[in-house]
UniProtKB/Swiss-Prot annotation:
Biased composition annotated in UniProt, kind: Basic residues: 190-200
Biased composition regions of type Polar residues, renumbered to the chain: 1-12, 23-38
Protein's recorded name: 60S ribosomal subunit assembly/export protein loc1
Gene source species: Sclerotinia sclerotiorum (strain ATCC 18683 / 1980 / Ss-1) (White mold)
GO annotations of cellular component type: nucleolus; preribosome, large subunit precursor
Keyword match Coiled coil: yes
Gene behind this protein: loc1
Taxonomic placement: Eukaryota, Fungi, Dikarya, Ascomycota, Pezizomycotina
């Protein structure tokens, strides 16, 4: 028997390429042959993504819209009184009426109201004038009192100065007489000694 030759396979992919009938790896025929076997549908994924979202997401959207649509009322609309505020009766706005407008039916009542307001204002002005006059009188009285005190102090100072001068004059005359008498007697020198002060 003759020895049979075996073909050595150098490349694993060589047998595949040999089956296709071409030696080139990335040929079009190879890709066609592989794709011819199985066909996949890609339309299903596209329809799912383009279609409507599932039901649980819809419910979530509805809840979000309900929360957004809820109206928030202000304190004014709810009629809550504002705290820490003292509002006079005239300033407070009654519901359904205009603030600060009082309509009078007859002219006489309007004139009486006007007269009352004017009298009140005049009284306030008069009281201010009276107060100003009183303050002026008080100021004048204080001024007069201050001047009187100053004059008294000046008179007192003048009196004290006069007394001191008189005492000095009297004291000087007495000393002069004593010096003259002693000079005649000879016990003391004619000129009196001057006082000297020495500082250390």
């Amino acid at each position: 028997m003759a020895p049979s030759r075996t073909s050595t396979v150098k490349n694993k992919n060589a047998s595949k390429h040999a089956a296709n009938g071409s030696g080139i790896r990335n040929s079009k025929t190879v890709s066609r042959a592989q794709s011819d076997g199985v066909s996949k549908s890609k339309g299903k994924k596209a329809t799912q993504s383009k279609g409507a979202p599932p039901k649980p997401q819809k419910q979530g959207n509805k809840m979000a819209t309900l929360k957004k649509k809820r109206r928030v009322y202000t304190e004014k609309e709810l009629g809550i009184p504002s705290l820490n505020m003292i509002t006079p009766v005239g300033v407070e706005k009654p519901k359904g009426k205009k603030k600060g407008k009082v309509f009078v039916d007859d002219r006489e009542s309007m004139m009486t109201i006007l007269a009352m307001v004017n009298a009140d204002k005049d009284g306030q002005i008069e009281s201010k004038m009276m107060r100003a006059r009183q303050m002026e009188e008080i100021r004048e009285a204080r001024k007069a009192e201050h001047e009187r005190k100053q004059e008294m102090q000046k008179n007192k100072l003048k009196g004290m100065k006069d007394d001191l001068r008189k005492k000095r004059k009297r004291g000087g005359d007495d000393e002069g007489d004593n010096v003259k008498g002693e000079a005649l007697a000879g016990t003391k020198p004619l000129k009196p000694k001057k006082k000297t002060v020495s500082f250390a």
